[in-house]
A protein has these predicted regions:
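Helix-to-loop junction immediately C-terminal to a conserved catalytic motif
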Residues: 54
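Conserved catalytic motifs of ABC-family nucleotide-binding domains
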Residues: 162
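The feature captures the beta-strand-to-loop junction immediately N-terminal to the Walker
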Residues: 39-41
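Conserved ABC ATPase "signature" region
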Residues: 70, 118-136
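Conserved ABC ATPase signature
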Residues: 141-145, 149
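Catalytic Walker B motif of ABC-type/P-loop ATPase nucleotide-binding domains
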Residues: 166-169
Length: 267
């Protein structure tokens, strides 16, 4: 993949389950290094789209290219290589409840490589620290953690193999406003420090205004618009207007404006 080439390129995608068509003629590009937020109403198929991109779905038509490779026709060897370049944080965290945080991260590390256990443990601690968790969280079980810490533990696991792209499904769902804001800043910091590309599904307007370079609106079975927020929030379509120009959208815009005004010059 060239530096200026789309990491994800989707053309003419159709996803359907029986007679129900979820997506029809959907196009989307995701550029290297960007944080793109995907929004849409309930039932618009945001998670279905994510699963199709990472090879967990079976689209009825269209093309999905990930790192320049056609997802549907990858060999098993190529698919394994591509999977190692993708970190995924599912909505429920999906940690193994019988394993400690460090052991959860270690599972991802040892799935593809035979590594000395001592090195695996040190790498797991590094990923746990990267995710903003205190090191004493390493020996705790998921049930002993708060909701925000579970999210961070799952994020540490998704970072285990040094991915190029992070897929996040509703990363701030269930977090209080302070926890959600801290998680947003963590994603921004990781993108900047590790050179990640981030594809996130969210309904959190504050997340969109705080960290997303572009927003893609999924409605009417396709991506209606994918652009910067100032373009998207003025897009002439009823759902988009209700979402961005309603009371919550206005509040998020005001909060983003206050935050921007409080930043030191040059940031």
């Amino acid at each position: 993949v060239n530096a200026d080439e789309s990491l994800i390129r989707i053309r003419g995608l159709r996803n359907q389950f029986g007679e129900q068509v979820v997506h029809e003629n959907l196009d989307l590009d995701v550029q290297r290094g960007e944080i793109i937020g995907v929004v849409g109403g309930s039932g618009s198929g945001k998670s279905v789209l994510l699963r199709a991109i990472i090879g967990l779905g079976h689209p009825a038509a269209g093309s999905i290219r990930l790192f320049g490779e056609e997802v549907a026709s990858m060999s098993d060897t190529k698919r394994a290589m591509i999977e190692r370049r993708c970190g995924v944080l599912f909505q429920n965290g999906a940690l193994f409840s019988s394993l400690t945080v460090a052991e959860n991260v270690a599972v991802a590390l040892t799935e593809h490589h035979a590594i000395d256990p001592a090195i695996v443990h040190r790498l797991a601690l590094l990923k746990i620290a990267l995710a903003g968790l205190p090191l004493d969280a390493a020996d705790k079980f998921p049930a002993q953690l708060s909701g925000g810490m579970v999210k961070r533990a799952a994020l540490a696991r998704s970072l285990a193999l040094d991915p190029d792209i992070l897929f996040l499904d509703e990363p701030t769902a269930g977090l209080d406003p302070i926890g959600a804001a801290a998680f947003d800043q963590l994603i921004l910091t990781l993108r900047d420090s590790l050179g990640l590309t981030v594809f996130l599904i969210t309904h959190d307007l504050d997340t969109l205004y705080t960290i997303c370079d572009r927003v893609a609106v999924l409605a009417s079975k396709r991506i209606l618009v994918a652009d910067s927020l100032d373009v998207v929030e003025n897009f002439d379509e009823p759902w988009v207007q209700d979402y961005f120009q309603g009371p919550r959208g206005r509040a998020a815009q005001r909060a983003a404006a206050r935050s921007s005004a409080s930043q030191p010059q040059g940031h």
